[in-house]
């Protein structure tokens, strides 16, 4: 089999055009092609809009064709797939997974499939009820501290748009994508360069994934929050769990800690118990909204709105004179800015898109890098304190009831309050309050954004448009701490504890978190095989 990369086609090209392009690249007739399989596709809008594909081809006289075609984009291809570990005997004490985000779910899934009968503990609710709780909050401003955009089945990623981007070639990623499809996602994610599931389809995927864990002998307990870890001689022995029926003790020898980046009370408990942690860099800022059609025009130019092109996205970054990174994050085409608070009287924003991505606006995080040197103290959890201070200030500036402070870009750059929307109507609910965001963002963040916006506008026309809307504050781009673990065994210094996923500081997004969950499950299964 041969792989052809960088195969360029007109947007909207049909399968016959793909076969013809493959034959041309290989310098053979179409009749010589035995099979053609699309591996990857993307849209390149830099010089005219083109579809760029990678394709696996079976062709007659393969070795002769490869030698003769002399095309640097053609190479021999032997597809590789992830091989799950062998099954194990069910242990006397079930492994426990804390947190039902991507890391916890895929860890529990692999453990269950291999016969380990895991117990998955999630502090929030099942996605069906969680969806109702979140939508009630957006309508009314009545926040449920146990079931919100941060806590519940699926983790924070359940209310994004299910972006499955990854920059690595780990074989686990193909396995994860195939599982998403098996559980209800579109097959397009297997080939799209920027795959996304869509928040609406994620609800279905999560329910099916949960059923698989249970059908394979696992157990899933919602509204069960781990409040303490019991230990003896440096090893985990049990967990104290708060549940609707009251507290109970759960014996445990293998505990996967995948709490998510917003489990601040869990971080505090771990600190009290002496579990090694360290502060880590992250980023804070705002969500920026534009009209989708304006960004489509900037990227696709005269092709905008034609050929069935998808709503465009973007990925932008720059550095200020002082070395601060300013960059886009979690861009949601055709989406909306959402209220993502998980603590009382604190405003947090995030972005979300459904599968169709057919909303009026596109939004993305516009973030500034921060390091532990920016935090208010040298404490391990000083990053949490820093986040809370920004969220408190945003709540006050928004005027209460989880209204978010908002400002037009032109007004932000001129340091004057906004009085209303221009061409771009903000999507955040329950509501926004027009003001000056300098009242809730640290001076160094404002300075970096004011320097960065024009630079990014030069990279993408209209990004710094006067009527683009900034909504504050975005603080939960990644975890403010790293729960220290061994690089080989994935264990904490507290034996039997396996920090995992984004909340533990070892991932950044759905794909990397899910892959980390698989890695930790593999290690536990190996240990169970030797017990």
Question: Which residue ranges define each predicted feature?
Answer:
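Residues forming the flavin
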Residues: 1-531
